[in-house]
Amino acid sequence: MFVNTVIAFIIIFGTLVFFHELGHLLLAQRAGILCREFAIGFGPKIFSFKKNETVYTIRLLPVGGFVRMAGEDPEMIEVKPGYTVGLLFNKEDQVEKVIINQKEKYPDALVIEVETADLEHDMKITGYEQGKEDELSSFTVSETSFFIVDGEEVQIAPYNRQFGSKPVWQRIKAIAAGPIMNFILAYVILVMLGLIQGVPSNEPMLGQLTDNGRAAEAGLKEGDYIQSINGEKMRSWTDIVSAVKENPEKEMDVAVKRDNKTLHISVTPEAVKDENKKTIGRFGSYAPTEKGVLSAVAYGATSTVDVTKAILTNLSKLVTGQFKLDMLSGPVGIYDMTDQVAKTGIVNLFQFAAFLSINLGIVNLLPIPALDGGRLLFLFIEAIRGKPINREKEAFVVFIGVAFLMLLMLVVTWNDIQRLFL
């Protein structure tokens, strides 16, 4: 069971992160931004392959992911005056590769001492060839050229391929696409569940009965149409639930229409405690379901909206103090919930995945620096001001945001450990 839970956790969390980052990747590529890496997880690489311009990687720690876009790189490679570099050329006599070190491994490279280098706008390098130190040469650099550092290729990004070069509305779309993709994923999962298992209906009928439940023991069957309970007409499934809850361990006269006949069956609901410790009745029947494309589409939409509202309500309670910080869950808590839900069946596991996907989308839209919501806030401010925020100031605010998130992660992880193991 432990192995099954680990696999389920990795698949669910990995899928949510994959689609989130896929949203960023697709919109960034559509805007013409060079995406250097698409990563699932953080830390050391476990697996990687390159397709077109992007390296796709799976990393050791399954706690998130990222899309590394040109212009946002923390390790920018610079070619400054006085540097000695090697140049390799394509068939059009444009520089195809700029060799930063280990030039001895490339005997065909033209070695120059750099005088000037503009690898963002003009795409030119000037310098002095060895043996021609009195003659300044100029070289055009291809827009699809590479640096070679320690034997590895790093694509050079002209300014028009960098994140910051794009209109603010394109950058907003690239950042917002991640959380939006999580909402789309949740909606698709819920629609699929609606198509496969049916959509809950409010008709006054019985759905699937639980084994050894009071309804099954009394002789009720799935599909029975409940006309009345104790003489009171039942107009909906909601009416049935209310009547059953009000009669714990009390015999009820249930009028049932079955095969065009009316039957009277006595049922005594089991007494159970609800979430508020109040005693209510339960007789072991699920809500009826109906199948159809339109009903599944509507179910996906309404369920996505309902879950979103519930999460936002809890977030507002967290701000007002009605919802305590120690009630939040981190990766450890989510793992435990995955374990509990996995035991109840694959359908509930998919519903849980949809809930987590919406949760991930909402959390990432919070205006906290280092999250997508924080980046969107900076971009909206830029759109209003007409110019970007100072990069150093933005970097400082993002650093504070990262520190806050790390602290929050430690707190919720400690809460999970205390709640589950101590």
From Swiss-Prot:
Pfam families in the cross-refs: PDZ_6, Peptidase_M50
Domain PDZ intervals: 186-271
Residues reported to bind Zn(2+): H20, H24
GO cellular component: a single term: plasma membrane
Entry's localization field: Cell membrane
Effect after changing E21A: Loss of signal peptide processing
Residue stretches spanning the membrane: 6-26, 175-195, 346-366, 394-414
Cofactor(s) it depends on: Zn(2+)
UniProt keyword list: Cell membrane, Hydrolase, Membrane, Metal-binding, Metalloprotease, Protease, Transmembrane, Transmembrane helix, Zinc
UniProt-listed CDD domains: cpPDZ_EcRseP-like, S2P-M50_PDZ_RseP-like
EC number: 3.4.24.-
Catalytic-site annotation from UniProt: E21
Entry keyword Transmembrane: yes
Chain's role: Is responsible for site-2 cleavage of the RsiW anti-sigma factor. This results, after a third proteolytic step catalyzed by the ClpXP protease, in the release of SigW and the transcription activation of the genes under the control of the sigma-W factor. Can also cleave liberated signal peptides of PenP and Mpr, probably within in the cell membrane.
Other remarks on this protein: Regulated intramembrane proteolysis (RIP) occurs when an extracytoplasmic signal triggers a concerted proteolytic cascade to transmit information and elicit cellular responses. A membrane-spanning regulatory substrate protein is first cut extracytoplasmically (site-1 protease, S1P), then within the membrane itself (site-2 protease, S2P, this enzyme), while cytoplasmic proteases finish degrading the regulatory protein, liberating the effector protein.
Family: Belongs to the peptidase M50B family.
Name of the featured protein: Regulator of sigma-W protease RasP
Source organism (scientific name): Bacillus subtilis (strain 168)
Lineage, opening ranks: Bacteria, Bacillati, Bacillota, Bacilli, Bacillales
Gene transcribed to yield this protein: rasP
